[in-house]
């Protein structure tokens, strides 16, 4: 079944279902843990999870019947909303939720303050009798919980109470180990169209037939939840103030396909203009842009959401590793709660960052960017794109507004004087939805407290003591340990500042990452990819078949003549100079003119052979046997890495240019599949906000192009919109994607009609149920689907003409560090006890005393000569690394060390002197915290008369064994690509930059650029850690917050290339036999590798497999196993195996006193032409670097070096075969760890 065929992705079927189920207490607790609930509402907003809220084989996309015609039905494609609504008999679920006070009243106050529209139920309509409906499907109403899932196209009908349940088509399905009855819901348009002039039937919130009035599913509580959770939030994103008008427009848009008509502009209010000093022309430009992007986003939300999607892996609840690994129900609840604690880092970023997508919905005109209009007083499109930006809208929430006729309307709310961020601001951005506000408060009660040092924790303590009076505004003293007032007291120092002046900032969004990426130090520069000719590489099938979606993704110069500013992508968002965009004649190789991947692969292979890293996981496996061993291993490693860097410099000089290196682009992709975040309704809410932000930002390009050519000449903005919107819509639909940022895909159907047996809707409206064969037509043969957005970063700063360069990247002096703080410090800490047994001093103090020449004589350091050589080596390596360190990031594992050293040396040898930027992934971890800072552990509202009594009670909790509360912190990943390889949920600041094409092209392109988090309360690891005014690392480093979902919510795919245990042993044995360690017999190392994971002596067939079929070698190993068996050896450690099996060799070596036969003449080159190039086979470990074919002088281990004059011919001979190893993924493996 083709994944690209629309009829396969979206089968014919209903787009809404009712589920009737009997929930046990365990299932209710699971739902309460994963859902959004509030004590004031009977509606629970649950995630859309297969195996929990819907059946395991639930299809997320359907072609649903919408209209009838003679002999058949017309179907439209839609996908289900990523949430489910439980609304009947939910007391058992709500009882498990935390009480956060009177959240309902908080939301009402926020509506009054900000003049938001409130939901009003239909006064003359009787709600559906749910007890009768339960009885109709054979269920007991008092024991049955009812919930609904609905498609995006039908949610307005659900709000209006017009969906018709067909109980005759009820089926039994299984949900979380129990049975449930599923009943389909059909839209009223199928039953209204009974006249010959079917188009005369009105589609409206208020107009309905008698049949729909009597049979429609109308639950006011469900309608109210949709009103606030979905529509009020959408209105905020679109700067639209009338949710009911938006619902009406969405209803008609889905049925009548009115995406190309103006729907919202006549009712739009223009907010946030009064605080800006704008000329008449600037105000017109801003109003028109506001209206156009609002209308386009509303129209294309229907286009993109009413499309066909694949279910995401993270929505398969029954297959979550977190679920399958749970031993019992309590263990499952603990794991789910810990997952939510991990997510608290992302929720905190959304709340505490002033540039969060929750707040970035105001459109402003930044005059400083647009005070240079062209002749005649008009503005160019590029000027408008620089001037019109999205900013934080909290400060303008209470301003007067303009209407469609550009008249000022007075603000109808009740603004307060105090503009500090408070609970009502949170209620505002939550759309005044109580369940959503309550969900945020749960997280605020569990994030870490950041004390300022002025009042410490006394503010929270004093608040809890004051709660004994029962005067809490939030809860009246009933639940002060968990109410929203206490939550805001806890995080008061982390709350965002409401900005007074608008400014351009990136927008913080939270979505799931995609696997493919180019985020290593130089990104896509020098990357090559094996692709099939039919795929066309990055412009063909990349990340899940997305054009331009491959890991190269790049940026820089476009070889096809597309646009370039040195950072953005070329045409199709593919790659430019650094990623190449080229494919060989055979269609097999795509990528750059040079092959950096080949060099990294060689380094990786070397590390494997020398047993420095695990060949599968990339974890460090180096074990220091002593100081001399340490020096020997890392001297050889450093030399090998430096030689590879020199070889790559030669290759780049021959085949590339400095501009290509300077244009290196890092890129990663963010998933826009709505079901990637369906496991948490709060994230689904943030997803919709993010999609609207993306669409409107891209829509600005189309809007400004028409505004420049068609000025506003009428009094009504909507009239101008009516004249031009159809053309604007068509232009946006053809140019919105494939411009470097937003990527969509057309899902097509090969046929527009089919035949099947469906309900006879006309007979059913007359009271007769019958299933008849009929023709089924599809309204559209193709639908666009959201795929992803691409975010880029350019690590190498390039100053403009006449610019001396940014002070943030300037590298004026090289700091000197002691070895424990240098590039090998992580190894010194790890092996301190082994290098200096019985030392008595911790690692850092030991090296401080060594570097200060103050080490006491009674500290045992071993042989003085060996110690001196060891210290000299470390000092030299540390100084050499610092001299070439352009990253300014200390390595923390062997992989990061060799990768950093390679790139540092390459860049320095190539002439780069300043610091470069870097990407860092901060992954969430859980740590224990102080009981006193987490009042929710009290279990009841506090009743303390003094801070001392509170402190005594907290001490009693610890004594009683109450577990310490957990909170999420973050740790920097050694390799940022591991964030994407583990399918992480990421929170990242993104700015959408627009730029014109080259060669005077009128095309405007865009790219997403990673930015910064605004505010000091987002996460302590993001704050400026140094008080020094010269430390600008925070300006060079870009961060993303991540929570790994692989092995937690996403089961790792086990494809054909899965490695079994025997394969892993074989790999390690072969590496041991190929190792060049002269201190140990390779066969003993192979024996150790086999026995390290086995408890018994292996069979001869197994050994033959491990040595790749070499019978002589297998026989020799079997002799050693037999010797172990005869002597009864049970200790299979490497030291003991060497003592037992390698004793004779050790005695011979010791007896020789270190003297060896001089066999160097046997390996001398026979002629001048036999010199080995660095790029081909690499230098022998004993060769002098000064004699390499690239003509570099590399004095000693510290490796300086400079180019010789006229070295071109020499270089031509020094790169032999360097590009022959292209292909493969090529990057060093990321370290694995669990959530």
Swiss-Prot record:
<feature type="short sequence motif" description="Required for filament formation">
    <location>
        <begin position="846"/>
        <end position="847"/>
    </location>
</feature>
<keyword id="KW-1048">Host nucleus</keyword>
<feature type="region of interest" description="Disordered">
    <location>
        <begin position="536"/>
        <end position="584"/>
    </location>
</feature>
<keyword id="KW-0235">DNA replication</keyword>
<feature type="compositionally biased region" description="Gly residues">
    <location>
        <begin position="545"/>
        <end position="584"/>
    </location>
</feature>
<dbReference type="InterPro" id="IPR043031">
    <property type="entry name" value="Viral_ssDBP_head"/>
</dbReference>
<comment type="similarity">
    <text>Belongs to the herpesviridae major DNA-binding protein family.</text>
</comment>
<keyword id="KW-0238">DNA-binding</keyword>
<dbReference type="Pfam" id="PF00747">
    <property type="entry name" value="Viral_DNA_bp"/>
</dbReference>
<feature type="region of interest" description="Required for nuclear localization">
    <location>
        <begin position="1232"/>
        <end position="1235"/>
    </location>
</feature>
<dbReference type="GO" id="GO:0039715">
    <property type="term" value="C:nuclear viral factory"/>
</dbReference>
<comment type="function">
    <text>Plays several crucial roles in viral infection. Participates in the opening of the viral DNA origin to initiate replication by interacting with the origin-binding protein. May disrupt loops, hairpins and other secondary structures present on ssDNA to reduce and eliminate pausing of viral DNA polymerase at specific sites during elongation. Promotes viral DNA recombination by performing strand-transfer, characterized by the ability to transfer a DNA strand from a linear duplex to a complementary single-stranded DNA circle. Can also catalyze the renaturation of complementary single strands.</text>
</comment>
<dbReference type="InterPro" id="IPR000635">
    <property type="entry name" value="Viral_ssDNA-bd"/>
</dbReference>
<dbReference type="InterPro" id="IPR035989">
    <property type="entry name" value="DBP_sf"/>
</dbReference>
<dbReference type="GO" id="GO:0003697">
    <property type="term" value="F:single-stranded DNA binding"/>
</dbReference>
<feature type="compositionally biased region" description="Gly residues">
    <location>
        <begin position="1214"/>
        <end position="1226"/>
    </location>
</feature>
<protein>
    <recommendedName>
        <fullName>Major DNA-binding protein</fullName>
    </recommendedName>
</protein>
<feature type="region of interest" description="Disordered">
    <location>
        <begin position="1214"/>
        <end position="1235"/>
    </location>
</feature>
<comment type="subunit">
    <text>Homooligomers. Forms double-helical filaments necessary for the formation of replication compartments within the host nucleus. Interacts with the origin-binding protein. Interacts with the helicase primase complex; this interaction stimulates primer synthesis activity of the helicase-primase complex. Interacts with the DNA polymerase. Interacts with the alkaline exonuclease; this interaction increases its nuclease processivity.</text>
</comment>
<dbReference type="GO" id="GO:0006260">
    <property type="term" value="P:DNA replication"/>
</dbReference>
